Regions:
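Surface-exposed loop/turn motifs at beta-strand-loop junctions within extracellular Ig-like
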Residues: 69, 164, 316-318
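Beta-strand-rich assembly/attachment modules of structural machines
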Residues: 1-120, 130
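Extended Gly/Ser/Thr-rich low-complexity repeat segments
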Residues: 53-68, 101-111, 186-195, 302-310, ...
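Charged- and aromatic-enriched interaction segments used to assemble
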Residues: 85-88, 92-206, 324
Length: 357
């Protein structure tokens, strides 16, 4: 086994992962890293109780593991270790960025500040972390009550994710907030070529027939909130998938910044939202396993890679599946240095349940 792909164990307070720490976990049976778009980023490792370093593996320790084909090795803090079963324990680790779930942010408010400055301010409570973003447009931002840093980043009303959207990338102690993390790769995963397994799931819970937009603001000189809605109340969403009325109620308050909130402006933003989001159509989630062509000798010159948030094409002629969609989840086999599976479609989780906890 190549030493560079074997997970390494570190003490709980480690911040420099360039050494071999407490030891290289050469007896590791399996190690998988799962990452979701703006969601879960975890490591699952199986290790024998007879392994050389078993006695050193405790909760809060850190495991360094390879998360995908292109990124640097990432640090995962152990939060759960199962009881031995047939002489093997299962070790669960969360990405080191989950430490930010326990770093508090006190209430503050700003009328207009760049996202880079806001990100730096939020991360100031833990000097191990730094932030980067390619967003530049300033917006009003506030924290009304004490929250964790991760809750301020995403998963709660008024978070950075809810204001700028985008996609987070967690690179050890660097928090990267991309406007678009992935790219349109041109990669095709096809039956008869490199597709080994496919599962398609269609969920219409995100399909609606109408959108009811509203926005709330407090007029200058008053303490009373004003709610702006449309005279027609809702805007229609074209769909042929459901016959019953199903309305999406959505708050657009965060989308105005310093601009005046009017019926006309609200209608324009709501129509833009309908146009940009497939609210009237089921977008299937496709989970596939495949053989990376770039790891096969005859295709070694290929520069193709599949990473989280990339757009790829899946084709299976026998099942009639042909879809181009965003990669929303990757499961990576660290020891084999290969992507075990990817999921394409709409985000299956959000930072509401995974970041703000």
């Amino acid at each position: 086994m190549v030493l560079s792909v074997i997970p390494v164990l570190y003490a709980a307070n480690t911040t420099d992962f360039s050494s071999f720490g407490l030891g290289v976990l050469t007896d590791t049976i399996s190690c998988e890293v799962t990452e979701e778009r703006n969601g879960v980023f975890e490591c699952l490792l199986k290790y024998p109780v007879s392994g050389q370093h078993y006695g050193l593996i405790t909760k809060e320790c850190i495991i360094k593991a390879k998360p995908n084909d292109t990124a640097a090795d990432q640090a995962f803090r152990i939060y759960r270790i199962t009881k031995p079963l047939n002489g093997i324990v299962t070790i669960y680790g969360q990405h080191i960025s989950y430490d930010l779930a326990n770093v508090p942010v006190l209430p503050f408010s700003t009328e207009g500040r760049s996202p880079q400055l806001i990100l730096s301010q939020l991360l100031a409570g833990d000097t191990r972390f730094t932030g980067w973003t390619d967003y530049s447009d300033a917006k009003a931002f506030s924290v009304a009550q004490p929250k964790s840093v991760r809750a301020c980043l995403g998963g709660t009303e008024g978070s950075m994710l809810s204001k700028w959207y985008g996609e987070f990338e967690w690179d050890n102690f660097t928090v990267k907030f991309h406007s678009h993390r992935g790219q349109k790769t041109g990669v095709v995963i096809e039956y008869g070529k490199n597709l080994t397994a496919l599962e398609q799931d269609e969920d219409n819970s995100g399909v609606y027939t109408a959108l009811l937009p509203y926005a709330v603001y407090t007029p200058e000189g008053t303490d009373t909130e004003t709610v702006v809605t449309l005279p027609e109340v809702t805007l229609p969403i074209v769909t042929s998938e459901i016959v019953r009325a199903k309305t999406l109620i959505l708050d657009f308050s965060d989308q105005f910044g310093d601009a005046a909130i009017t019926e006309e402006a609200l209608r324009a933003k709501a129509n833009s939202y309908i146009k940009a989001n497939p609210l009237g159509t089921t977008i299937p989630t496709v989970t596939v396993s495949f053989e990376p062509l770039w790891k096969q000798p005859e295709y070694s010159a290929l520069l193709e890679r599949v990473n989280l948030c990339d757009t790829v094409t899946i084709r299976h002629s026998l099942l009639g599946v042909s879809v181009s969609a965003m990669v929303i989840e990757t499961v990576y086999d660290t020891l084999a240095e290969r992507c075990k599976s990817i999921s394409l479609g709409q985000s299956k989780s959000s930072m509401i349940t995974t970041i703000s906890e």
